Amino acid sequence: MEEKLKKALNILNIPVFNLRGDESLPENIVYKVSEVVNSYIDNEEDLIEYRITVVLFIRGGLKRKKDAIKRSLKEHGFLLSYKTPPPLISDRTDIIQQAIECRYYENVSN
């Protein structure tokens, strides 16, 4: 799943990091993945739900870049959250910070 996520996020050719970005770069994308294992009657893993938060740290072109990331995530099988928080803009650095939440489901039952 993580390789698929990285491939989806590389659509903009902006460096992608897990958990912590590189503050020296003018733009980067950071993601965090939480795993939830769902089991049913037999108490064995049946479905893994990945809850993913992607944060864009960009200097401009928010709508175009956000739309490209969302489109790429959908094309790679990720389900987007209906609600996207408003962007945060740093007065000091002109960096726009935009979070995108999505989920991915993996069937692990035999």
Write out the residue ranges for each language-model feature.
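Long, contiguous binding/interaction regions
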Residues: 1-51, 57-110
